Amino acid sequence: MGILRFVLLISLNLVLFGFKTTVSQPQQQAQVPCLFIFGDSLVDNGNNNRLLSLARANYRPYGIDFPQGTTGRFTNGRTYVDALAQILGFRNYIPPYSRIRGQAILRGANFASGAAGIRDETGDNLGAHTSMNQQVELYTTAVQQMLRYFRGDTNELQRYLSRCIFYSGMGSNDYLNNYFMPDFYSTSTNYNDKTFAESLIKNYTQQLTRLYQFGARKVIVTGVGQIGCIPYQLARYNNRNNSTGRCNEKINNAIVVFNTQVKKLVDRLNKGQLKGAKFVYLDSYKSTYDLAVNGAAYGFEVVDKGCCGVGRNNGQITCLPLQTPCPDRTKYLFWDAFHPTETANILLAKSNFYSRAYTYPINIQELANL
């Protein structure tokens, strides 16, 4: 097992050290015609801005390093999907669906919403948000909008959508803002780790299948990262006598159960359950673990604290309006109590695009070229 991890790290180093933590200028033409994004605050780029929600990031210093400033992204600069869109060659970032007008929908849309989950009630403790079911329904509406630009020719629209990439990153909030919040939700009483993961997978299968029914053929499905080790959890467990370390391993163990089921789901979908589709699984748990454990190799000096936040690990309270963040965000793995920095997002996007170290069964570049 140690040899395997060594080989993975060497391969990732070869990928990452061949690049700076910037994304090159887009190519003349994008490798795919459009990119559709479904997810939570890790990839939300402004859909929550006008909602009555605590899950918003439309204030400084969020966006301090982003060319357009504060937009609603939950980081200092680009999100993972921003970096991915640039690598794919898009001239502009994929806009939030809440602000798309006219033919812009033909290049894709971002439906992601902070606090969203696979389950509809997930994130209700934080206020309004757009759940995965709601995001999928918004996408079906978008498909109807797109049809007019194909003169009502559904076959032509299907051929167009079959060349696009669909990204889905869900599950984190189903644990952080549902299963492991017993004072607000009853799921931990009604389920155990195994049955809760099975329930999520059942719902997720239906959601991904509906995307397929409305044209999705090249689909990226991410696992959940090592969220038991984010600054918020480290702050809570910092002073506890925990023989396994400062992370909340109870959460991590539950995530491993879920991720195992997501990877199996990808296998099932690729083996003919959805004809003509190709799904790629991103192992976010392994990639975030390796970035944290080997942070110095990737230029990170701080891997256990947020760049912006309050309290232990800058994780007891997340980044506040007009708070002064750390001066050099490139040295931090985490931007706030929950979310990675732009630097981490770019590293992860590049590794997933060019390497199979954390992708299965192929990488994103190979998916785009299908």
From Swiss-Prot:
GO molecular function terms noted in the UniProt entry: hydrolase activity, acting on ester bonds
EC number: 3.1.1.-
GO terms for biological process, alphabetical: lipid catabolic process
Keyword vocabulary terms for this entry: Glycoprotein, Hydrolase, Lipid degradation, Lipid metabolism, Secreted, Signal
Signal peptide range in chain numbering: 1-24
Pfam families the UniProt entry points to: Lipase_GDSL (PF00657)
Catalytic machinery residues: S41, D336, H339
Main location: secreted
InterPro entries xrefs: GDSL (IPR001087), GDSL_esterase/lipase (IPR051238), SGNH_hydro_sf (IPR036514), SGNH_plant_lipase-like (IPR035669)
Sugar attachment sites: N203, N241, N242
TM ranges: none
GO cellular component terms listed in the entry, alphabetical order: extracellular region
Subcellular location: Secreted
PANTHER family xrefs: GDSL-LIKE LIPASE/ACYLHYDROLASE-RELATED (PTHR45650), ZINC FINGER PROTEIN (PTHR45650:SF12)
Family: Belongs to the 'GDSL' lipolytic enzyme family.
Protein name in the entry: GDSL esterase/lipase At1g33811
Organism of provenance: Arabidopsis thaliana (Mouse-ear cress)
Lineage: Eukaryota, Viridiplantae, Streptophyta, Embryophyta, Tracheophyta
